[in-house]
Each structure stands twice: as C-alpha cells, then as structure tokens.
Regions:
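Active-site substrate-recognition segment that forms the wall
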Residues: 1-5, 95-106, 113-224
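Dinucleotide-binding Rossmann-like beta1-alpha1 core, especially the glycine-rich loop
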Residues: 1-43
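Short aromatic/hydrophobic contact patches that present stacked aromatics
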Residues: 11-13, 60-62, 148, 168
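Alpha-helix N-cap/helix-start capping motif
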Residues: 18, 43-44, 72, 93, ...
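Helical element adjacent to the flavin cofactor pocket in flavoenzyme catalytic cores
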Residues: 22-34, 53-119
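General small-molecule cofactor/ligand-binding pocket signal
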Residues: 39-41, 88-90, 218
Length: 224
C-alpha cells in the first residue's frame, strides 16, 4: 500500500434552512432502502460532529461510512506503484489515431510514436467520444465542467468532509489548506474559466464556515 491521506471518519451534509432539511429527510429513505448508513442530525448534533460550522445551521445528514483522501497524493501514489510493478507511463503524450487488423485495434498512433498492444482500453473521460470517432464508434459521454478553489490556512479547519445542501458545494480538508468544489456546467468541450462561478462557491461556503470569503486562494482549477 501507500499513504494518500485517507480518513474514514464519515462526512456531514449541512443545511441552512428547514426546507433543505426536509428535502434531505425525504431523500434519506433511498439510502435506507439500499442499506447505506445515514442519519438525520439536528443543529446541536451537527455542531458536535463538526464544531467549525457556524451556529446558524439547521442540521443535516451524517454518513458514517464516508471518508476523504488527498486526490493528488492518491494519483501520484498509484503511478509510482504501477511503475514499480513494470508499467510504462507515457506522460504528455496524445493519442492521434489507430491501426487495426481484421477488426482489432493493434496500434495506437501518438504524438511520440506508435504503441503496440494486445488489448487497448479507451478511458479518456470527456475526450472518449472524440478519440472513438477515429474507430467509427459512438461513445455516449457528455462533458461536465466543475470547479474547485483551494484556500490556504483557513480561519477554521473542519474535522470532516462537508457537503453544503443549498450551495451545492463540497469541502475537503487538506492539512493546512481547504478545497471548495462544486458546480456542473454542460457546455461541451469548453475550457473557459468563469470567475463568477468561483466567487459564488467561495461566498456561499462562508454561510456555513466562518471566514472563507476572505481566505487566501492558492489554486483555482476547472476540469471536464
């Protein structure tokens, strides 16, 4: 194994209003149906689980089996493990075409030469439909753009990963930093950056956790 910051303390969905709390109460029945542990918590119980929250919250839902990781450490760790087991990683290499023989793909043409393999897996995420067109295949994937903002040394550091119901934002503690993630834009392969989305996420989060609107931003990310 390898260390990637895993903590399995659960997660807490937080509501500011009674309307949101009632909506989550109705949805929790689905979790019960699939035997996924989840429990409604009132304001005092939520603050007991996560003292960093503002006392103006109404309550929420606690998911005891949830956990958190540091995504970068996880991906880097996987790459290092794979390399140690003999895998070859071709970074900064773009697939630009294929060669096939009798209905089987035998080679991948890349910006750094050809790669030959017995089996080829297409796992290009949002780019899969574009790559698959070269094979006359239709892959039903729709790109969805999301954003994250990482702030340094926030005024408070939550114990748990948090989900903010009304703001539709997720909070992941990362040591001396805090990552705020959310939004979903269905805009095709659009890599443009919308600063209003980022500001809205940060400002909305400040209604649940103190001081986030003024916290120092060290990274803004968007991806498909």
């Amino acid at each position: 194994g390898f260390e990637f910051g895993f903590e399995g303390k659960g997660s807490l969905l937080v509501c500011l209003t009674r309307q949101a709390l009632e909506k989550e109460r109705r949805e929790i029945r689905l979790f019960e149906e699939f035997k996924i542990p989840a429990s409604m918590v009132n304001r005092d119980e939520a603050l007991g689980l996560e003292p960093a929250l503002l006392p103006s919250i109404m309550g929420g839902v606690y998911y005891p089996r949830d956990g958190r990781i540091d995504p970068r450490r996880f991906v880097v760790g996987l790459a290092e493990k794979a390399s140690g087991l003999g895998a070859q990683l071709h970074t900064k290499t773009e697939a630009i075409g294929f060669e096939s023989n009798r209905g089987r793909v035998t080679k991948v043409r890349t910006t750094r030469g050809e790669l030959t393999a017995n089996q080829i897996i297409l796992a290009s995420g949002s780019w899969s439909p574009q790559v698959a067109r070269a094979l006359k295949l239709r892959v039903p994937i729709q790109p969805a753009k999301g954003y994250s903002v990482t702030v340094e040394n926030p005024p408070v550091t939550p114990r748990l990963p948090l989900l903010f119901s009304e703001a539709r934002v997720v909070i992941n503690p990362l040591g001396h930093a805090l990552r705020i993630a959310g939004t979903l834009e269905l805009a095709g392969m659009d890599f443009s950056f919308n600063p209003r989305r980022v500001a809205a996420m940060q400002n909305a989060s400040a209604e649940y956790l103190p001081g986030l609107a003024e916290a120092k931003v060290i990274e803004i990310w968007r991806g498909l």
